[in-house]
């Protein structure tokens, strides 16, 4: 009988301790946890495309967890960080959405192969300049095509024209 009463006594002590411990963390944490406001961050995202175009997106985010914030931008490269501001950049393995609609490869006034939004004109500003080309080495129809602009709508078309033009670089 003494054995049962000792067992009941131990069981009672363990149950009391368990009830105390289960309630203890919430009481202890409530007293120690400080309330923090989420961090407000201006995020700038830059996508750099093969054709030289850059798209920029601005976002304002509330950051509750830095681990979650960094995980959300795992595929991006951190370029700049200061209080309340973060700049991320990503190299895209494609041409820009705008170039898929209206991209042209042409030659600038100084004979440099360049990409343009729309047909190259004397006043057109190139998106990206690539390399100098010797126009005299080109066949006359290729010269004309390049001067009026060669359209590209896909990454493959863009790469084909650039690779072909490299053979005429000076």
Curated annotation (Swiss-Prot):
Source organism superkingdom: Bacteria
Keyword Ribonucleoprotein: no
GO terms for biological process, alphabetical: sporulation resulting in formation of a cellular spore
InterPro entries for this protein: BofC_C, BofC_C_sf, BOFC_N, BOFC_N_sf
Gene3D superfamilies: Bypass-of-forespore C, C-terminal domain, Bypass-of-forespore C, N-terminal domain
A Pfam cross-reference name: BofC_C
Signal sequence extent: 1-30
Keywords: Signal, Sporulation
Role, per record: Inhibits the SpoIVB zymogen from undergoing autocatalytic activation by an unknown mechanism, and in this way plays a role in the sigma-K checkpoint of sporulation.
Self-association state and partner proteins as the record states: Monomer.
The protein's name in its UniProt record: Protein BofC
Organism (species): Bacillus subtilis (strain 168)
């Amino acid at each position: 009988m003494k054995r049962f009463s000792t067992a009941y006594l131990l069981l009672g002590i363990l149950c009391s301790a368990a009830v105390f411990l289960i309630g203890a963390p919430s009481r202890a944490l409530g007293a120690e946890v400080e309330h923090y406001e989420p961090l407000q961050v201006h995020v700038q995202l830059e996508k750099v495309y093969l054709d030289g175009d850059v798209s920029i997106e601005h976002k304002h985010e509330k950051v509750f967890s830095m681990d979650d914030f960094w995980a959300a931008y795992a595929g991006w490269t951190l370029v700049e960080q200061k209080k309340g501001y973060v700049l991320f950049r990503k190299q895209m393995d494609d041409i820009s959405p705008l170039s898929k609609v209206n991209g042209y490869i042409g030659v600038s006034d100084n004979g440099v192969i360049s990409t343009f939004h729309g047909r190259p004109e004397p006043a057109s500003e190139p998106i990206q300049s690539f390399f100098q080309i010797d126009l005299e080495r080109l066949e006359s129809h290729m010269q004309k095509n390049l001067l009026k602009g060669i359209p590209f709508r896909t990454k493959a078309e863009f790469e084909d024209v650039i690779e072909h033009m490299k053979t005429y670089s000076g």
